[in-house]
Amino acid sequence: IDLLVIHRWDYDTPIEETMRALNDLVKSGKVLYIGASAMYAWQFQKAQNIAERNGRTKFISMQNHYNLLYREDEHELLPYCKDANIQLTPYSPLGCGQINKGLAGGYASL
């Protein structure tokens, strides 16, 4: 697997256990890289810090909810990812259809 992405923070499992398991998958050669999706900035940074502190594999990507209507991640998550050189793969770029409503032939009706 080139990139294994975990989706959402698991409140029932200690993040140390999750990061250890992900590291084991990378070290075994079953996974090349790991990424995360749909986490708060503090959760993502906590996971990264735990991985770094324990010499484990860190995330290389964040799949975040981002579009013209939802830009909340611009406050903390995006600046953190930019500073840490973590790639972003936004989901819902058309806002679940809210942004492209009224488009005809690919152009907005004015």
What feature does the model see in each segment?
Residues 10-110:
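Beta/alpha (TIM)-barrel catalytic core signal, keyed to glycine-rich beta->alpha loops juxtaposed to Asp/Glu
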Residues 3-4:
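Acidic/hydrophobic-patterned starts of short beta strands in beta-sheet-rich repeat architectures
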Residues 7:
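Histidine-centered active-site/metal-ligand motif
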